[in-house]
UniProtKB/Swiss-Prot annotation:
Organism this protein belongs to: Enterobacter sp. (strain 638)
Region (Disordered): 53-72
A matching Pfam family: SlyX
Family membership: Belongs to the SlyX family.
Compositionally biased intervals (Polar residues): 54-65
Protein name: Protein SlyX
Gene designation per UniProt: slyX
PANTHER family: PROTEIN SLYX
């Protein structure tokens, strides 16, 4: 009787292990995909930041070139 109980418990543990291995593989794939996406987004953010800085510096006058605001 005890051997049957041990066999059932062992089978249950093996089943859980198999499901855990599948889950770990899926999570690993998800993490890898997210890392690639984050790298692309970092590159895009860097590019957009450079474009915004270039646009701001070319379209905005320096404070010394600005005319003073009218006084009331």
């Amino acid at each position: 009787m005890q051997d049957t109980t041990l066999e059932v418990r062992l089978a249950e543990l093996e089943s859980r292990l198999a499901f855990q291995e599948v889950t770990i593989d899926e999570l690993n794939q998800t993490v890898t995909a997210h890392e690639l996406e984050m790298a692309k987004l970092r590159d895009l953010l860097r590019l957009l930041t450079e474009k915004v800085k270039a646009t701001q510096s070319s379209h905005m006058a320096s404070p010394s070139e600005e005319t003073p605001p009218p006084h009331y």
